[in-house]
A protein has these predicted regions:
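Catalytic machinery of carbohydrate-active enzymes
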Residues: 1-320
Length: 320
């Protein structure tokens, strides 16, 4: 049986989809698993033993009717038996329909029910994202201790050599940025949390975040902090993150990556988001003080309410 899965479009959500993929393989061990994903999340799925085929949508084909038709029709030669959509977009349902898949399974949202053959009941809004995906196959839990991201020996050797070249040992990964500006950690809070620390910090982020990373370094010039923003691909960053001592993370894709790899991860959340998108790794802790404000003022109060003591106690709890 050929089973296709339409991946979520964000790195964090892609990471949260990995338990779903593993459960599909457990349910159908002899099936061929095909992942359809955007280019910027493809690194999450590389070398996964449960994935037989990874089809990457080129960056230039993300939108438009012509591209949608082209992608959907190009999948017909795969003879897909079952197609799951882990994104709620209308476009994904059209692509599934055009693929000729016999069963097309997804939640009936955004008026796309016409293109789906099976429409499981939409779970409550406060169900965790990873469990929402599992609802598509009538599962309500998964084993968080399993491996979900896989690196080759060659990749890990590259990572160890790269860390050696950076002349760092036992470094701490720092992810202060997020796609949503409101989730980005305030500079003064970062300074408070790492003040007088003897750790070696590596800041991860995109090229557009490099200027902000330099500001963090300047504000803490007595500490060992190095910015890697924009210097490595997502896959390369993932390899380096897998070698860190622990990670301090905002509500971001990299935070989910470090957690699901198995790196001890402390994540900072606001506005009750940890309920739905908290990290799922066994060695992870979410600091969420969003209960302090009524009415909720989004992330203005809760992120700023997190103290150095909160961070230090979480580090002690999460480290082996």
């Amino acid at each position: 049986m050929n089973i296709a899965i339409y991946s979520p479009n964000w790195v964090g959500d892609a990471a949260l989809s990995l338990p779903f993929i593993s459960n599909i393989k457990l349910k159908h061990p002899d099936s061929k698993i095909i992942i359809l994903c955007k280019k910027w999340v493809s690194s999450v799925y590389l070398n996964h033993p449960d994935i037989d085929d990874l089809i990457v949508i080129p960056s230039g084909k993300n939108n438009g009717l012509v591209n949608t038709l082209s992608i959907g029709l190009s999948l017909r030669n795969l003879n897909i038996d079952v197609f799951y959509s882990l994104t709620d977009s209308f476009r994904s349902a059209i692509i599934m329909w055009l693929s000729g898949a016999i069963k097309r399974i997804g939640f009936n949202v955004q008026g796309r029910g016409l293109f789906l053959t099976h429409k499981p009941e939409l779970p409550p809004k406060k169900v965790h994202r990873s469990l929402k995906y599992l609802r598509l196959i009538n599962r309500t839990k998964f084993d968080s201790n399993g491996a979900f991201i896989f690196f080759t020996e060659k990749e890990l050797l590259w990572g160890k050599n790269e860390v050696k070249n950076l002349e760092l040992k036992d470094f701490v990964a720092l992810f202060p940025f997020s796609i949503a500006a409101a989730r980005t950690l305030p500079h003064e809070k970062i300074s408070e949390w790492i003040n007088e620390s003897n750790e070696n910090y590596l800041i991860f982020g995109s090229d557009k975040e490099s200027e902000e990373a330099e500001k963090i370094i300047k504000n803490n010039n007595d500490l060992s902090i190095t910015s890697l923003c924009g210097k490595y691909s997502l896959r390369e960053s993932m390899i380096l993150i897998s070698l860190c001592k622990y990670a301090l993370a905002t509500d971001s894709g990299l935070g989910h990556i470090s957690s699901i790899i198995g790196v001890p991860t402390i994540s900072f959340f606001g506005a009750n988001r940890s309920i739905v998108t908290g990290p799922i790794g066994e060695h992870s802790i979410s600091i969420d003080k969003s209960h302090r404000c009524k009415p909720c003022r989004k992330n203005i109060c809760c992120l700023r309410s997190i103290t150095k003591a909160d961070v230090n106690s979480s580090i002690i709890k999460v480290l082996p």
